[in-house]
Structures are given as structure tokens and as C-alpha cells.
């Protein structure tokens, strides 16, 4: 019985370490995104998104498919650093769905001289070629 318990505890601790490593990678990606945004660097901000025509972004104007179209929308909506402001994310829930997928819920806030903005988001991450990437974003 002790051997079975030891084996189970070993597997559980391995899974917990893996999940922590995955969560750390996702948190780092989001930190990198906010740092890029706060520098006024939308292109670097977009490195967290899957560079693919199947990327899905849902916002107040509806659904946008594709990395390039999403980048264009960001550039159009935030044409300069005063419009971009300073971005902060508050993560409310991180849930590992499988070894390949993570679901994140959180809040975003833009501190701006022209008026602050804030809202909520859900992100679907997929591990692609060993890297966590945002494949779907619903921000409001």
C-alpha cells in the first residue's frame, strides 16, 4: 500500500511541477506583451499571438480571423502611444484544459492621459512547437 501511495504522490508532484512551468511560461508571455505595449511596440505585443490565419479575435466590432488582420485592427485602434497608454493585466483564472491547451480569464486596464479604458478577456492558449501561443482572444 505504501508503494502505491508513493507512486501516486510522485505522479501528482510531477504533474504539479509541469503545470507550474506552463503557468509560468504563460504569465511570462503576458508580462512580455504588456511590456511591449507599454513601449508602444504593437508588433512585439503581437508575438504572443499565433501567427496564423486561423487566429480568432473577438472584440466590440465582432470576430476577426488572422494574425495580420488582428495586428491591423490594433494599429488602427491604437495609432500612437497616447492612445495605447500603459497596459496592466490582472489574471483571474488560469485553467489547464490538457497538455496542449490553457484557458485564461482576466481583466485589462489602460491608464491613459486621454481617458482610461478597462475590460475583461478570455484567452485560449495552445502549445505549438513547444511554445504557448494565444489562438483565441475575446476582449471586451
Residue ranges and their predicted role:
Residues 42-97:
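A solvent-exposed, acidic/Ser-Thr-rich amphipathic alpha-helical stretch
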Residues 118-140:
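Short beta-strand edge/turn micro-motifs at domain boundaries
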Residues 81-82, 110-116:
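Short, cysteine-centered beta-strand-loop-beta hairpins and adjacent loop/turn segments enriched
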Residues 1-4:
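Positively charged n-region of N-terminal signal peptides that target proteins for export
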Residues 74, 89-95, 108-110, 120-126:
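Hydrophobic/aromatic beta-strand elements that line small-molecule binding cavities or substrate pockets
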Residues 9, 14-48:
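Short, low-complexity N-terminal intrinsically disordered segments enriched in polar/charged residues
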Residues 99-108:
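A short hydrophobic beta-strand element
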